[in-house]
């Protein structure tokens, strides 16, 4: 139960996420965020908090060889194997957005796709995608999802990655 939205601008990539944490049918008040900046990457995830924690731990010492779909897929495959070795099962449960070296990627299971405009994932993705389509920022898009979906809630966390080459 989450929403993560991101948008590629001329000079930066902006990613925002809600902060809901659910256990069973109960919402937990917590400071657990679904988005983090680690090792020169910004990653936002939806799904299992356990898998997200494992991803963040893995990212401390690993990153893709380059900002290409192929190398991000290799990174995800290696994470999946590592996760299995750690006892978390090797199948990926979560969807992720990854900003790396001025590029934005959507990751769903073993599918990696570079995003050139905007994207949203999670329970509030339809609301957030509509807001992004209408020209709103990722933070505004997540706010719309928080207002309209019972599965996501504030506070909203936002990270930015500058595009030095202004591609």
Question: Residue locations for each model-derived region?
Answer:
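Short hydrophobic alpha-helical segments used for membrane anchoring or interfacial signaling
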Residues: 97-101
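Short polybasic amphipathic segments
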Residues: 94-96, 156-157
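Low-complexity, intrinsically disordered Gly/Pro/Thr-rich segments
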Residues: 141-147
């Amino acid at each position: 139960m989450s929403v993560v939205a991101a948008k590629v601008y001329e000079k930066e990539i902006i990613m925002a996420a809600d902060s809901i944490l659910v256990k069973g049918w109960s919402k937990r008040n917590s400071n657990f965020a679904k988005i983090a900046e680690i090792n020169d990457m910004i990653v936002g995830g939806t799904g299992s908090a356990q898998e997200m924690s494992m991803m963040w731990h893995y990212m401390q010492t690993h990153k893709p060889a380059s900002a290409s779909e192929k190398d991000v897929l290799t990174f995800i495959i290696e994470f999946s194997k590592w996760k299995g070795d750690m006892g978390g099962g090797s199948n990926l449960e979560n969807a992720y957005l990854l900003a790396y070296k001025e590029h934005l990627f959507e990751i769903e299971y073993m599918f990696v796709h570079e995003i050139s405009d905007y994207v949203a994932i999670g329970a509030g993705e339809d609301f957030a995608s509509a807001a992004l389509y209408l020209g709103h920022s990722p933070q505004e898009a997540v706010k719309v999802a928080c207002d309209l979906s019972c599965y996501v809630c504030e506070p909203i966390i936002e990270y930015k990655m500058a595009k030095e080459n202004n591609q």
